[in-house]
Amino acid sequence: MIQLAGDFSRSIGMLFQLILPGCALLALALSLLTAVRVPAAVNWRLAVLVGELGYVLALVPLTVGCTALTGYASAPGATLVTLGACALALIFLLKPSAQAWQLGRELPARLAAAFGPVPVTRPAFALANLGFRTPAPGPMQTHEFAPGLVLDYYPAAKGSGPAACVVVIHGGGWDSGDRRQLPGLNHWLARQGYAVAAVSYRLAPAHPWPAQREDILAALAWLKTHAGQLGLDPARLVLLGRSAGGQIATAVGYLGDPAVRGVVALYAPHDMRFAWSVSRPDDALNSLLLMRQFLGGPPEAREAIYDSASGQQLVKPGTTPPTLLIHGTIDTLVWVRHSRRMAARLAEAGVPHLLLELPWATHALEAHAGGPGGQLTTHALEHFLAAVTAPAK
């Protein structure tokens, strides 16, 4: 019995002197992903998890800290280290929610100033809305719009007349990804009264630019031709792209088609010469290889191709549609400066626009609909789409 008691005492001592401090320091290290750009060696998806679910992960340092308090008498030094690390981890894990609350207070006024006021009743961000929300799936049809290319069509769930249509262009570095990427947003948009077309396009390296532009233009032409049977308004289209899809969205959406009422680009590059200049072979994506595959070589050898793929070079006063840009400040895969430079060019040309920059966020910031990034993104989309697709009076 005495031996067992001694073993138990040593186990408890190890818990308070080694295990709890280790857990606390690990939690602190993970929490820092809400404040610093993820090193290339760290999977960026981990940063998405920590940033958008920090309010849940905060239970870990909270539990560890409370447990450590009970052992202060036996291991005061280790307990203080544990408590300090837990306190810092809590701050960083809850930082996204605090920053989202502050941004949410300002966002409605910023959206109204950029695109005009619209009746949006729900708050941009609410702590009560944090949680796991999976949009209920609605009907979806698959159609071939060109040989070998299909789109998924989500009919608008409400509304009496032809619906405005959001054309969703997937990301994936131009050489991967598909139209089924993050479908929850498509179902949510359909429930808001918009038709949604999630389109496929040919991928590099087998199909370099401008194949992707041709495919999206073909999809737009098909949607317009079949607007009557689909129940959409061919004169009210919005392009929405993520990452590489955002690059395609601006490069196509800025060609001057009056039916394109707006463009939404999430964490995307828009000036391919600039993208080449800041890329390295050892970055998280091996961006130089991706761009060689996509654009056929370096900019000095493919000047016209680089220019036609750069929405920033296509901005024109009076014809470029209103644009919503959303980007995470600490995005490792696509530098936030891409969106900042695009916003500056749009401002210079007098194009209505807004850059929503999320300080804690990285790539795929809207993947968790109930998280800080998801709430702010859907609010911004709700306002933007209502403003730019309003029927002409």
Predicted regions and their residues:
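C-terminal catalytic histidine-bearing segment of alpha/beta-hydrolase fold enzymes
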Residues: 13-24, 33, 39, 51, ...
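N-terminal cap/lid segment of alpha/beta-hydrolase-fold proteins
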Residues: 38, 45-64, 115-160
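Hydrolase active-site cap/lid region
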Residues: 109-125, 250-304
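Short beta-strand/loop motif that positions the catalytic acidic residue
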Residues: 318-319, 325-327, 331
